[in-house]
């Protein structure tokens, strides 16, 4: 895969995350997540609806700030920070996403509380 595609995939993930996590525009977010989205996270119910329902369940003050982002072919890894969710510590997450035809189709993650 060439760098232009990988750059496009990174931009897609950042736009998708901003649309869902910060703007909370669920209708617009549907265009980024496949209806057959595979969720491997132990913290999120299966599928696109599981992810969307999780975000609907946290306070509207939720904010996502992306950090390092890397692409390798159809995979994008983004390390970011979730705050404003009502818990004492921000969540730090490394999300791995697989993209097919410009849509997020699969997700894995690792996360923990922010440490000073």
Residue map of PLM features:
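C-terminal and inter-domain tail/linker signature
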Residues: 1-116
């Amino acid at each position: 895969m060439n760098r232009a595609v990988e750059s496009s995939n990174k931009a897609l993930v950042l736009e998708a995350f901003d649309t869902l996590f910060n703007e909370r525009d669920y209708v617009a977010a549907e265009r980024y997540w496949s209806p057959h989205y595979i969720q491997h996270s132990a913290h999120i119910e299966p599928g696109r609806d599981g992810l969307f329902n999780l975000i609907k369940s946290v306070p509207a003050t939720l904010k996502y700030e992306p950090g390092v982002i890397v692409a390798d072919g159809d995979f994008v890894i983004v390390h970011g920070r979730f705050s404003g969710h009502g818990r004492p510590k921000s969540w730090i997450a490394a999300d791995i996403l697989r993209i097919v035809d410009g849509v997020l189709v699969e997700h894995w993650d690792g996360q923990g509380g922010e440490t000073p």
